Amino acid sequence: MMQKQNMIVVNQKEIAKNIYELVLQGTLVQQMNEPGQFVHIKVAEGIAPLLRRPISICNVDQEKNEFTMLYRAEGQGTKTLATRKQGEMVDVLGPLGHGFPLEEAEAGQTALLVGGGIGVPPLYELSQRLVAKGVRVIHILGFQTKDVVFYEEKFAELGDTYVATVDGTHGTKGFVTDVIDNYGIDFDILYSCGPLAMLRALEGRYKEKKAYISLEERMGCGIGACFACVCHLQEDPSGHSYKKVCSDGPVFPIGEVVL
């Protein structure tokens, strides 16, 4: 159930170049039961920036009423958020959207989790949930360069983890698909979040597989009212049918929406 709450900053730190880990505390965490959902953050107390910022949920600790977000500080809004200190309050709306379907993966199966850049964070909570139900997980994390790699060790604690960097400064040189090819990775179900180019490459390979992708889109309202994040359906070539990333997604079965 979506709620709005002022949550307290437990901790915030930079964990890679311009990548921040923010831990917030509040009873809203009790509503976070679906990995892959996101929250909308009001980054400042004044009018500007006007729009909330959508940030995925990386980790949930309901015993402590805490959840973790990872985000890249690159625009005015997220740079402002990066200045928040322990004990300050942050206005949070969420949880929003439909997350990854855990029920599609069965105990004993292998799930491949593929993340690119700031699309990596929601896969961490997903991986923990899958491991808890007896699913074997394999992670492939793609980044531009070594300086922006994060959470490699945390993912490695849950299952086999591979890293690809475009410039080859860490892990496999190239893209996540190069890792799949180099290591002959096979799987029963695929979950992925990242840039459109990466998702298109995976869709081209695995249309016949059981696979789910999470779309990174700029959003306005976050609740399906403003129509700023619509995407068209592949089954309708006329382009008249669409779904909204924020409320119908952000997770969709692979092949359902036009990338």
Swiss-Prot record:
Record-linked InterPro entries: Cyt_c3_hydrogenase_gsu, Dihydroorotate_DH_ele_sf, Dihydroorotate_DH_Fe-S-bd, Dihydroorotate_DHASE_ETsu, FAD-bd_FR_type, FNR_nucleotide-bd, OxRdtase_FAD/NAD-bd, PyrK_electron_transfer
CDD domains on file: DHOD_e_trans
A GO BP annotation: 'de novo' UMP biosynthetic process
Binding positions (FAD): 53-56, 70-72, 77-78
Keyword ATP-binding attributed: no
Gene Ontology terms for molecular function: 2 iron, 2 sulfur cluster binding; electron transfer activity; flavin adenine dinucleotide binding; metal ion binding; oxidoreductase activity
Protein name per UniProt: Dihydroorotate dehydrogenase B (NAD(+)), electron transfer subunit
Subunit-structure text: Heterotetramer of 2 PyrK and 2 PyrD type B subunits.
Function: Responsible for channeling the electrons from the oxidation of dihydroorotate from the FMN redox center in the PyrD type B subunit to the ultimate electron acceptor NAD(+).
Record's keyword annotation contains Methyltransferase: no
Names of required cofactors: [2Fe-2S] cluster; FAD
All copies of domain FAD-binding FR-type, residue ranges: 2-102
Keywords: 2Fe-2S, Electron transport, FAD, Flavoprotein, Iron, Iron-sulfur, Metal-binding, Pyrimidine biosynthesis, Transport
Record organism: Bacillus cereus (strain B4264)
Family per record: Belongs to the PyrK family.
